Each structure stands twice: as structure tokens, then as C-alpha cells.
């Protein structure tokens, strides 16, 4: 049976040498297969969960993270502390019913809190992450030593479970088939030991060939296939490492790009500059035959550089970009692969590796995200297969792996530990059941305090293109170490809220100087237009998207200001000023005014805001409204809030609640879920947004309908059902936040109970 190990418990006896940590591994989460673990009842539950997912896999794409529930001893059919409540349509929602629902929800949710104080949950969704890992481990010859047979079996289970009915795989688990998803996952299965004619492999191969073959894969896919040896480097558009030698004042210097963009293209440029290809094995030779509609030696690689299957083409290359890549390919690259210009190429490669090592060491070899994690691992092996850097990388592979009833996946980060915990604290506090769940809050409080980043990155931040970090919070763990603006804001809000509660219940408050450090970071992140981006200041211009080579993703080249990040920061600064007047008060006031103007400017004419990190208009609507309220705006004095309420109310479903499809993100048009079904997370976001805007004073009917939906949807054990995917990044790729299904219904019902049902 698979068991989740967290924190220091996740470190084996022989692992300590190759696992660096500045926090005693706080928040680390690793799944380990324990053959003797689990009772007969638990093993039966695991079998049932797997079978149920597989049988319904074409209709329900999300796992329910049932392995966590099973491990922590909460059976799905068991009730909480109080009996379940079901309200009839039109029945009055009484406070007792809400309190009963909340008690059951918190009884369940507190029971799955980890010993470190955070909540561990599925952060999967993208279907291109696992194949990259498999390819890198295969090329470096460590696939079977890093991944046990149980890991490999679960990975195959996952890939098969998320194969679409047409035989292909999507960009993410709910998406239609793409060449990027299909070719990479087909390759992953082959490298994991699947025979070319086993199971659904022929159907997958047919999809690939029927859609033109793997020459139509996106640029990221072309790179992975080139590394493996089943695609030629001459079929890639150039990624010259010399960009890292350019002066910083140039607007297209990599240091000015969004950190995820530059940290992915950094190792890609190294591999491209090296033209690295792994060992040509029998499987590689076979894949050269399996993936293409014409013989491998007859493929026109120059033409293939700009070939992209129409199913993948979310962001088509502008003509100017094709001309640029063509010039670099035909003129620049022939020069820089020969003496004397080759000496500059060698210097550029050395510079790239210096930046790779800096990133690795500052994240304890976790890295910013899963893509650059695996690419950096590969680069370290290419540089020196016997290096300590490579060995340190291998020990962090398992930080990204998550197993559930749908199999083992690679997550979009090393977890969402701090993010989910900060939200969970705010949700629990909203219920006013603090005395009942003091131990839960105390553990969560300790986790938040210990997760704060307490030092800046070493060295000159200008050399390594880093922002100040001291006082910030990360998305996941302190060992990961990258600051994010809204994570800092939510972490600060959670710490401030708990500081208002009795210390004997929730523990000692965070020291004032550390709160001030967080405020200093937030103030340093405001852009000229008043908005806040994600990781850093916006360092260049939107026109740089003209050179975005990733056909699958939108708005990736620079770090844009976001409604969500701006609103969260406004709330945190407002609460801080209220509780700690005197620290940079005038600057905080000015920042909030400028941020409010940014939110109003970002609002669309129909009253909506586009959400960049959640699905989509409901998510951004919640943030937009509460940000303006934090700035002192009200429904009566702010047209933007009135328009936002009108927009959200216009999307209410006939039976109550809201249900928004991920297609809203992709197409930038509000789209209901298929069949006009409500979604509990969307409903919770809108319920909180409308409460914040004073809807109860005008017409509470939509609020009552939403609350009734949440209560009636609760499961017998107090859990809430997992529904469609609710996270997004780069406009077009969805990501799972499994904890959201509990956090936001609890939070919304807490707000509803104490701000709407006042009697």
C-alpha cells in the first residue's frame, strides 16, 4: 500500500547526505510503497477506488485523492460528529443547518491535516510533465533505480487512465487530444516498459499518425524528443545560449523575462547549445519508426521547425517570429558552431550552467517548477554524470510525485503546502469554531511561521536576476524558496488573523519585525501601473510576446500584473495597517489607492475580471470585489463593484449556484460547465464575493440558494465531492487543486453563517 510520508519522516536513513534542507524538511511530502502496510479493509478501499476511477475515467477526469482519506482512517461512508443535513428546494436555510454542516466539514478536514501542520493534496493536471521526467531518467540511465517497479506501474496506470477515447492525450487531464500530449505520453509508456502493441498503444499510435506524426509536436516536445534521439536538433528552432551574455539593458535579456520562462529556457538553451542526444537504444530506434508517417531519414527537418499540429496551436507564431528563427537557424547557428565563434558559444554554455547551479543550490535542488527541475537534472548529468549535483537532483525527484486512485503523476510544483494552509486558516477562522479546532489551527500556525523565507538569496541579486526575498512566503515550502506575491499576502493575512486570537489556543503570534519584513516585500513588488505580478516586478514589455516560441501557452514571456495578486496584496496591507499602524503607513495607503485603480482599469466592460490562476471569471470576480472593498470601496460608491455583482448574478444557474468551465480560461469568454451543472468551488467564490459586496442587504436569495447547494452536496463523512478542474496557468493549461473542494465551501459557509444569517 502507498503511504504518504511528510517532513523529516520522508527522509530515509541513507538519504540525508543527498537531501539539503534549511527547515528540517518541513512540508516535504513523499509517497512510499510499503508492501506490508494497510489493513485488509484499507486494501479493499484502495482497490475499489482505483476501479471506480477507471470505470468512469472518460466522464470524471479528477481523482478524489482518496488515498489520503484512506491513510488517515476516514472512510467515505462514515459520518462526522453530527448527522448530515439535506435541505429541500425552497426550504429556509437555518443557522443550525449551516453550523452542523461546518462541524462535519471541519471534523473531516482537520483529520487529514499532516503532522507538519499543512494539508497535502493532489496538484496534478498537466499531461506533459511526467513524460519529461521519464525521458530524462531514461537518458541518464537511472530510470529503474530512481523509480521502483511500483512507481513505474502507477505511472503507467495514470497515463492509461487519462488517455482520451480517441486514443490521444491532452495538454491536461480534461483537455482534448493534442500532439504534445499524445506523442510524449506514448513515448513515456514505451520507456516505462510498455510494448508497442500492448493495450491501447496501437490506438494511441494511430492518433499520432492520423494527425501527421510527431513532426507536428510543439517546440517543447521537439526538444524532449531531440534529447531522446527520436527527433533531430535541426528540426528545432534555435535557442542560443548567447542570450545570457547580452547586456541587461536590452528588453529581451532573459533576466527581464518571467522567472518560469527564463528558468525553462535556461537549461533548454544549454541542451540546444550542446546538441545533446542520449544513447541510441533499440527502443529509440523503434520509436523513430513508430512516431512518423514517413521513414525517419526522409523527414524534412527544416520544414518541421515550424510544423505544429492544429490541435496544439493555441498561440500561433507571428510571421516575424518565423523570420527571426529562420535567420538564426540558417545564418547565426552555422557561425556559432564553428571556430572562432564557437569560443563564445562555450562561454555562453558555462554561463548558463552557472545560473543552473545557482538555481539548484538556492532551491535545495527542488527548482522553481517541474519543467526546469527535470531539465536542470539532465544538464547536470550532461556536464558531469558523476557529479554531486546530479546525485542531489535525483533525491528530489520524489518531491514532485503524487499518487492517487488514478495513478502516479508529476505535480505542477513540489506541492501547494503554504498556499493551501494559508487559505485553510482563513476558512476555519471564518467559521468561528476556533475553540473546537484550536489544535488544528495551532499546527497550521506553526507551519506558516516556519515557512516564511527569512533571508535573501546569496550573492548579488542583480547578477542572478533575483528580487528581495526576506519576509516573503513561498507557494509550497521554505526549502523551495521562491517568493510569490499572493502567497506572501495570503501567508501574511493568515498570520495576522491568528494574531487576533488567544495565543493559548492558536500559539504565539509571528514577531512584528517579521510581519514588517513581509510588508516590505509586498511594497517592493508594486509596478508602475499599480498592479502586482506573481514573482517579481514586470521587467520588460508586453510586445515581447511576439517572440513567445511556446505554441501551447499564452502570456509567458514577462511577469504580468494580475488581478488576483493585486487584490490579495491589498487585503494583506489593509489588515496589517489596521493591526500595526505606524509602519510605512503613508506608503501602504498610496499603494492601496494605486492598486484599486489598477483593479478598476483591469475590469472588462461587462463587469467581469479575467482570472489567470483559477477558473476563471468567478475566481477573479471574488478577488476583484474583495480587493476594492479592502480599499474602502462599497457597492454604493463604486461602479466597478456594482458592475461586478451584476455580472456574477447574471451567471447564476436556474437551480442556484455557479458552474464555470475551464473553457472560460482558454477562450476568454464565460462558459458554463456542460449541462449547466453547478460547481461547489465556483459557487463558494461567488457566494463570498457577493457577501463582501453587501448582497445580503439587497437581495439575499442568491446567497441562500448557493448555501443550500453547498450543504446538500456535502458527503456523509463531511468531505465535499471532487468536481471539474479549477486551477489554470498560462491561459491554456489547467491544474488540479484538490484541497479547494473543502477549503472554499467551508470558508463560504462560514462567511454566510456569520454575515448573512445574523440572527
UniProtKB/Swiss-Prot annotation:
Reactions accelerated catalytically? (S)-2,3-epoxysqualene = cucurbitadienol; (3S,22S)-2,3:22,23-diepoxysqualene = (24S)-24,25-epoxycucurbitadienol
Its UniProt pathway annotation is:
Secondary metabolite biosynthesis; terpenoid biosynthesis
* Keywords recorded for this protein, A-Z: Isomerase, Repeat
EC number per UniProt: 5.4.99.33, 5.4.99.-
From the UniProt record, list the coiled-coil ranges: none
Application of this enzyme or protein: C.sativus and L.esculentum expressing S.grosvenorii genes SgSQE1, SgCS, SgEPH2, SgP450, SgUGT269-1 and SgUGT289-3 accumulate siamenoside I and mogrosides III and V, thus providing a strategy for vegetable flavor improvement or for heterologous biosynthesis of mogrosides.
Function of the molecule:
Oxidosqualene cyclase involved in the biosynthesis of the highly oxygenated tetracyclic triterpenes mogrosides and cucurbitacins. Cucurbitacins have cytotoxic properties and exhibit deterrent taste as a defense barrier against herbivores. Mogrosides are nonsugar highly oxygenated compounds used as high-intensity zero-calorie sweeteners; they also possess pharmacological properties such as regulating immunity, lowering blood sugar and lipid levels, protecting the liver, and acting as antioxidants and antitumor agents. Converts oxidosqualene to cucurbitadienol.
Which miscellaneous remark does the UniProt record hold? Cucurbitadienol has anti-inflammation, anti-cancer activities, and acts as a precursor of traditional Chinese medicine active ingredients mogroside and cucurbitacin.
User: Which family is it part of?
Assistant: Belongs to the terpene cyclase/mutase family.
Q: What is this protein called?
A: Cucurbitadienol synthase
* Encoding gene per record: CBQ
Amino acid at each position: 500500500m502507498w503511504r504518504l510520508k511528510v517532513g523529516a519522516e520522508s527522509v530515509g536513513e541513507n538519504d540525508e547526505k543527498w537531501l539539503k534542507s534549511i527547515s528540517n524538511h518541513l512540508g516535504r511530502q513523499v509517497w512510499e510503497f510499503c508492501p506490508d502496510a494497510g489493513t485488509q479493509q484499507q486494501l479493499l478501499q484502495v482497490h475499489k477506488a482505483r476501479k471506480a476511477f477507471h470505470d468512469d475515467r472518460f466522464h470524471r477526469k479528477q481523482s478524489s485523492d482518496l488515498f489520503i482519506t484512506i491513510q488517515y482512517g476516514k472512510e467515505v461512508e462514515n459520518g462526522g460528529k453530527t448527522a448530515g443535513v439535506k435541505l429541500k428546494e425552497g426550504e429556509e436555510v437555518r443557522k443550525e443547518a449551516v453550523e452542523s454542516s461546518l462541524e462535519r466539514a471541519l471534523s473531516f478536514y482537520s483529520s487529514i491535516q499532516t503532522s507538519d501542520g499543512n494539508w497535502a493534496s493532489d496538484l496534478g493536471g498537466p499531461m506533459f510533465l511526467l513524460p519529461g521526467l521519464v525521458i530524462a531518467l531514461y537518458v541518464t540511465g537511472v530510470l529503474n533505480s530512481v523509480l521502483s517497479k511500483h512507481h513505474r506501474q502507477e505511472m503507467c496506470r495514470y497515463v492509461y487512465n487519462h488517455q482520451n477515447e480517441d486514443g490521444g492525450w491532452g495538454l491536461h487531464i480534461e483537455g482534448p487530444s493534442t500532439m504534445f500530449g499524445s506523442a510524449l505520453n506514448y513515448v513515456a509508456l514505451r520507456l516505462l516498459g510498455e510494448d508497442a502493441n500492448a493495450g491501447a498503444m496501437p490506438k494511441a499510435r494511430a492518433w499520432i499518425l492520423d494527425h501527421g506524426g510527431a513532426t507536428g509536436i510543439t517546440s517543447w516536445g521537439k526538444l524532449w524528443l531531440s534529447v531522446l534521439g527520436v527527433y533531430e536538433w535541426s528540426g528545432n528552432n534555435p535557442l542560443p545560449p548567447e542570450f545570457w551574455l547580452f547586456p541587461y539593458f536590452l528588453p529581451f535579456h532573459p533576466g527581464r523575462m518571467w522567472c518560469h520562462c527564463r528558468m525553462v529556457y535556461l537549461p533548454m538553451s544549454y541542451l540546444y547549445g550542446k546538441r545533446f542526444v542520449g544513447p541510441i537504444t533499440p527502443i529509440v530506434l523503434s520509436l523513430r519508426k513508430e512516431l512518423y508517417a514517413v521513414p525517419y531519414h526522409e523527414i524534412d527537418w527544416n520544414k518541421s521547425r515550424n510544423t505544429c499540429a492544429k490541435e496544439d496551436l493555441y498561440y500561433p507564431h507571428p510571421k516575424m517570429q518565423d523570420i527571426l528563427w529562420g535567420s538564426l537557424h540558417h545564418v547565426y547557428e552555422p557561425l556559432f558552431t564553428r571556430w572562432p565563434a564557437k569560443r563564445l558559444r562555450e562561454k555562453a554554455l558555462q554561463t548558463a550552467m552557472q545560473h543552473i547551479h545557482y538555481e539548484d543550490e538556492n532551491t535545495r535542488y527542488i527548482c522553481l517548477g517541474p519543467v526546469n527541475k527535470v531539465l536542470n537534472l539532465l544538464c547536470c548529468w550532461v556536464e558531469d554524470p558523476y557529479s554531486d549535483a546530479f546525485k542531489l537532483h535525483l533525491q528530489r525527484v520524489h518531491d514532485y510525485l503524487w499518487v492517487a486512485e488514478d495513478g502516479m503523476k508529476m505535480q505542477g510544483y513540489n506541492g501547494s503546502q503554504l498556499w493551501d494552509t494559508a487559505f485553510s486558516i482563513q476558512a476555519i477562522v471564518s467559521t468561528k469554531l476556533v475553540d473546537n479546532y484550536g489544535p488544528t489551527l495551532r499546527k497550521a500556525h506553526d507551519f506558516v511561521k516556519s515557512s516564511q523565507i527569512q533571508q535573501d538569496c546569496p550573492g548579488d541579486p542583480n547578477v542572478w536576476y533575483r528580487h528581495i526575498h526576506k519576509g516573503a512566503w513561498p507557494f509550497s515550502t521554505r526549502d523551495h524558496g521562491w517568493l510569490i506575491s499572493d502567497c506572501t499576502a495570503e501567508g501574511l493575512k493568515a498570520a495576522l488573523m491568528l494574531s487576533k486570537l488567544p495565543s493559548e489556543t492558536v500559539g504565539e503570534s509571528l514577531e512584528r519585525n517579521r510581519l514588517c519584513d513581509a510588508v516590505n516585500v509586498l511594497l517592493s513588488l508594486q509596478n508602475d501601473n499599480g498592479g502586482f505580478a506573481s514573482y517579481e516586478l514586470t521587467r520588460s514589455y508586453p510586445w515581447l510576446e511576439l517572440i513567445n516560441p511556446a505554441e501551447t501557452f499564452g502570456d509567458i514571456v514577462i511577469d504580468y500584473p494580475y488581478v488576483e495578486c493585486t487584490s490579495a496584496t491589498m487585503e494583506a496591507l489593509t489588515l496589517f495597517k489596521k493591526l500595526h499602524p505606524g509602519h510605512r503607513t503613508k506608503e501602504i495607503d498610496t499603494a492601496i489607492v494605486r492598486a484599486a485603480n489598477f483593479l478598476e482599469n483591469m475590469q472588462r466592460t461587462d463587469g467581469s475580471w479575467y482570472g489567470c490562476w483559477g477558473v476563471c471569471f468567478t475566481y477573479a470576480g471574488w478577488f476583484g470585489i474583495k480587493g476594492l472593498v479592502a480599499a474602502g470601496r462599497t457597492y454604493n460608491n463604486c461602479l466597478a463593484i456594482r458592475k461586478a455583482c451584476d455580472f456574477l448574478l447574471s451567471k447564476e444557474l436556474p437551480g442556484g449556484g455557479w458552474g464555470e468551465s475551464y473553457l472560460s480560461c482558454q477562450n476568454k469568454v464565460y462558459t458554463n460547465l456542460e449541462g449547466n451543472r453547478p460547481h461547489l468551488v465556483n459557487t463558494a467564490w461567488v457566494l463570498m464575493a457577493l457577501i463582501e459586496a453587501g448582497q445580503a442587504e439587497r437581495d439575499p436569495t442568491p446567497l441562500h440558494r448557493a448555501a443550500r447547494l453547498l450543504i446538500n452536496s456535502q458527503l456523509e463523512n463531511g468531505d465535499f465531492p471532487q468536481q471539474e478542474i479549477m486551477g489554470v496557468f498560462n491561459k491554456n493549461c489547467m491544474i488540479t487543486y484538490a484541497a479547494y473542494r473543502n477549503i472554499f465551501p467551508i470558508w463560504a459557509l462560514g462567511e454566510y453563517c456569520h454575515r448573512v444569517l445574523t440572527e
